[in-house]
Amino acid sequence: MTFQTFKRFVLMSVFFMTTSAVIYAQQSTMQGLIGQSLAKLQQPTSESILNCIAEMKRIDDMFPDSIQPKFQIALQSLNYSVMNPHAPQTENLLKETEETIAKMENIKHADPSDICTLRGFL
């Protein structure tokens, strides 16, 4: 009887270790993808900002429960709108930014100060 209990304990321990390793790997992957995308903005042009926004949207699709891609989408959209106020994409980006901020408000672990800052710039 004690061997079966020990066996279950070992299996549960292995399961939890594996789960935590997978979660950590996903977080580091997301951080790496965001870092690569933002690194392309060393010399921000309207094209590079739009490409960064598109990449962040893909990252957000890969990690839908994470706030960081959503924050970067909103931030870069606002950045583009300030740099190119008369560009044809600006109005759509501002609408999408408002929707993104609304999504961020529904995430439990979202930082209220980040949301208020983005909403203030909107």
Sequence positions of predicted segments:
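N-terminal segments that cap or nucleate solenoid repeat domains
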Residues: 29, 33, 51-62
